[in-house]
Amino acid sequence: MGLKAAQKTLFPLRSIDDVVRLFAAELGREEPDLVLLSLVLGFVEHFLAVNRVIPTNVPELTFQPSPAPDPPGGLTYFPVADLSIIAALYARFTAQIRGAVDLSLYPREGGVSSRELVKKVSDVIWNSLSRSYFKDRAHIQSLFSFITGTKLDSSGVAFAVVGACQALGLRDVHLALSEDHAWVVFGPNGEQTAEVTWHGKGNEDRRGQTVNAGVAERSWLYLKGSYMRCDRKMEVAFMVCAINPSIDLHTDSLELLQLQQKLLWLLYDLGHLERYPMALGNLADLEELEPTPGRPDPLTLYHKGIASAKTYYRDEHIYPYMYLAGYHCRNRNVREALQAWADTATVIQDYNYCREDEEIYKEFFEVANDVIPNLLKEAASLLEAGEERPGEQTQGVQSQGSALQDPECFAHLLRFYDGICKWEEGSPTPVLHVGWATFLVQSLGRFEGQVRQKVRIVSREAEAAEAEELWGEEAREGRRRGPRRESKPEEPPPPKKPALDKGPGGGQGAMSGPPRKPPGTVPGTARGPEGGSTAPAPAPAASPPPEGPVLTFQSEKMKGMKELLVATKINSSAIKLQLTAQSQVQMKKQKVSTPSDYTLSFLKRQRKGL
């Protein structure tokens, strides 16, 4: 059983538009042919990014010239996907799979696949791969690479298993995706899960097992169960997102970028990206490089990705916020970038850092110890230059420099680190070390003391204790004195922003869009019904609270450092000590506690006692 007659009529594919036309036709079917589409994309990518030299020893292979926009009068060449080439590759793949899997040995009760059958298909793909190759190399994600080079990367293996299952008529087997891993779901309503590929250094022994253990340990790799369960159209979107346009470290294929952008817009228009936050971020990045007339701007697409994560995945995806922060960083929007990174840390704080989460650790490490310090360093230089030569800078440059005079930016920086510290609490692997502390001190030092002191850090525990004490005093002394000052309900609190709910329907700082929030307020770090309270603590009548953002820390480390963080002069030694000390001894707690109970009492000892 090969290609259908309707599919054959679309060949040969001589241009980007021809490939888009093929995808549109397949997406119009109930079951788009994953094998066909992956072979076509792999073929085009190979001759546009891997082997750009026009071969003379393959008579069936030709290249279609077309005018190039740059330089004027130049030509660009597109590899012609002839029917004979694609049909031969298609027949080879389907014959290999059907010849190796005897479906009669695996009864399908109720028309659903068994774990043994899924494991068998994954064995066929796995055992067909080369024994030794660099598994992180580029351009080995498609079935074209599998057939012609017997090489696949990690997610490519998972996709190949799904494509093979479709070729066998197993319609219940679908791709499952987290932000750094892939496996399959199958059975009634996709309730069963099975590992089919490796992750990181390789976990061959996990193939066939469920992902329940990873979900239970609250690792980012499995997103606490909030992973994507793809249908066939989303699996097409996955292969489009997997297109790698890089020719080398410094050059991308313009044709592949255009092809990916057009295919993503096709999927967007058909509604197949609604549940795919990372695809929306990918499309936004492409639009930033080359805007499409009449289409939504990149910022709108980034926010759509965040909205998708909130609506369908309990706001437990990291990369939608990373995409947004990267956009603002590239455009030197310091305040917005810091806010998006803080929102990213607010999401990660509810995970446990596990051994296989090294990819997201590297992301946060780079942001905290490279990107943010350099962004603030540049802002400091612009601020200094503006003070020396006032009136010579553009409004955007002035805005970038003035970020260091904005207490709201400082509050976002603290919220970012608060999320990282909370992420570490209860985790089996420490996160923070002295390298983090060094750059934290450096970033704190970019803000003047009077700016830092405008941020008001409150503690719900302190508020509760003070309220309890006040009620006790009222009971004892109510008959002996007049009403307390705190009992005046008509006395309005200082302006503040209400707490942001991170649930599926809740708002988020990064989702507020163009309207600016009231000055002097930032969202708290907590998520869900009980988190993020930004209400100020009752202040003594003699010292009214300072104007500025109000922030509630969630992590015990940041709570222990709150006086140091807003002090007039930064005590770098004390900050470094307190940020790293618990990381060194967190597995030797003095009492049995839940993951959220994270005592820092030993940090109050004298230095010689440590």
UniProtKB/Swiss-Prot annotation:
One of its GO terms (molecular function) is transcription cis-regulatory region binding. Residues 484-500 have a biased composition (Basic and acidic residues). Pfam families: Menin. One of its GO terms (biological process) is negative regulation of cell cycle. Its main location: nucleus. The modification Phosphoserine is found at residues 487, 543. It is found in: Nucleus. Disulfide bonds: none annotated. Residues 537-548 have a biased composition (Pro residues). Coiled coil: none annotated. Keywords: Chromatin regulator, DNA-binding, Nucleus, Phosphoprotein, Repressor, Transcription, Transcription regulation. Residues 462-552 are annotated as: Disordered. Signal peptide: none annotated. The keyword Nucleus applies. It comes from the Eukaryota. The modification Phosphothreonine is found at residue 594. Residues 214-390 are annotated as: Interaction with FANCD2. One of its GO terms (cellular component) is histone methyltransferase complex. InterPro entries: Menin (IPR007747). Component of the MLL-HCF complex, at least composed of KMT2A/MLL1, MEN1, ASH2L, RBBP5, DPY30, WDR5, HCFC1 and HCFC2. Component of the menin-associated histone methyltransferase complex, at least composed of KMT2B/MLL4, MEN1, ASH2L, RBBP5, DPY30 and WDR5. Interacts with POLR2B. Interacts with POLR2A phosphorylated at 'Ser-5', but not with the unphosphorylated, nor 'Ser-2' phosphorylated POLR2A forms. Interacts with FANCD2 and DBF4. Interacts with SMAD3, but not with SMAD2, nor SMAD4. Directly interacts with NFKB1, NFKB2 and RELA. Essential component of a MLL/SET1 histone methyltransferase (HMT) complex, a complex that specifically methylates 'Lys-4' of histone H3 (H3K4). Functions as a transcriptional regulator. Binds to the TERT promoter and represses telomerase expression. Plays a role in TGFB1-mediated inhibition of cell-proliferation, possibly regulating SMAD3 transcriptional activity. Represses JUND-mediated transcriptional activation on AP1 sites, as well as that mediated by NFKB subunit RELA. Positively regulates HOXC8 and HOXC6 gene expression. PANTHER family: MENIN. This is Menin. It comes from Canis lupus familiaris. The lineage of its organism: Eukaryota, Metazoa, Chordata, Craniata, Vertebrata.
